[in-house]
Amino acid sequence: MRATTATIDLGALRHNLNLVRQRAPGSRVLAVVKADAYGHGLLRVAPGLAEADGFGVLRLEEALALREAGYRQRLLLLEGIFSMDELGAAAQHGISVVVHNAQQLAMFEAMAAASVKPISVFLKMNSGMNRLGFKSQAYKQALQRLEACPVVADVSLMTHFATADEERGIADQLKEFDAVTAGWHHPVSLANSAAILRFPEAHRDWVRPGIILYGASPVSGVSAASFGLRPAMRFTSEVIAVQTLEAGDILGYGARFTATQATRVAIVACGYADGYPRHAPNGTPIAIDGHRTQTLGRVSMDMLFADISQLPDADVGSQVELWGEVVPVDAVAEAAGTVGYELLCAVAPRVVFKVTG
């Protein structure tokens, strides 16, 4: 069997969840598991996050899968509902819903009170990111309309920060949110991963960790390890062939690499069809038998190349870490000009997944 494997470490997930609790000891934790748990597999990771106070998902189907698997804590649809049928299903299964636009609000008002169990709602403010949510001048009226709906059990308040991971920080958005909601007595959820780590003033009643649960960094240029995080995914394969190049020999499609001296090259069973970034350049970090080295040439559909000139023991069958413990996913992402989030979410269905811990 082809060796390309993603191993999910439940112990690392538990560790990272505990770190969130240490950072925000007064807050409940809504573990964000959208996008199939950032590519790790929703029902694979759920046991490692079972002590979370709730789960944030994108699609109703994800919430129903968690309910069917026996998870009884709060489930929150982060984009809300898109039809009256979805609203009814959310009510039936005790799923909380974000409301971020007038159309969703109107659906709540149109739902007959006797037909569903009351639903917990998170009302989203657009405090400056300009993606989802009611602008500040419309926010109070939206709250009043929701609270007048018989199908609404309770309302929490939320917003999302655009630059919690950057030098600009959250001050402007936090000021906007606090000014509008001053004197209100509702549970509040503000902090994403970066804000959990950097801005304790935003922790409030609920925090919403995402990428940090999976052991990657939300802050460019700052390692996950420096925050005490552990990688939840180890993406591995093996060497399936070795070639020795002479000076002047080219390597792979497009001749992206030309040897300037004798070079030993490992051919690794992993390519862009497995989720490795095709645009990763020469020099992207990779580990062979636990030793860090670098890629060479262009990534192809099923294979990539690694320099083993300084690893005389490396040969066919040697173990390869694409990212994980020796090579953080953020290091590969930085070399490829992207973010760890994208790489984790892009691991392909043909990769074998295993669970440990």
From Swiss-Prot:
Biological process terms in GO annotation: D-alanine biosynthetic process
This protein's pathway: Amino-acid biosynthesis; D-alanine biosynthesis; D-alanine from L-alanine: step 1/1
N6-(pyridoxal phosphate)lysine: residues carrying this PTM: 34
Matching Pfam families: Ala_racemase_C, Ala_racemase_N
Binding positions for substrate per the UniProt entry: 131, 301
Gene3D superfamilies (alphabetical): Alanine racemase, Lyase, Ornithine Decarboxylase, Chain A, domain 1
GO molecular function annotations of the record: alanine racemase activity; pyridoxal phosphate binding
One Gene Ontology CC term in the entry: cytosol
Cofactor(s) this protein cannot do without: pyridoxal 5'-phosphate
Domain of life: Bacteria
Catalyzed reactions: L-alanine = D-alanine
EC number of the protein: 5.1.1.1
Extent of the signal sequence: none
Residues annotated as the enzyme's active site: 34 (proton acceptor), 253 (proton acceptor)
Class in the EC hierarchy, top level: isomerase
Keywords attached to this entry: Isomerase, Pyridoxal phosphate
PROSITE patterns according to UniProt: ALANINE_RACEMASE
Similarity comment text for this entry: Belongs to the alanine racemase family.
The protein's role, per its UniProt record: Catalyzes the interconversion of L-alanine and D-alanine. May also act on other amino acids.
NCBIfam families in UniProt: alr
HAMAP family reported for this sequence: Ala_racemase
Protein name as it appears in the record: Alanine racemase
Provenance organism: Methylobacillus flagellatus (strain ATCC 51484 / DSM 6875 / VKM B-1610 / KT)
Gene: alr
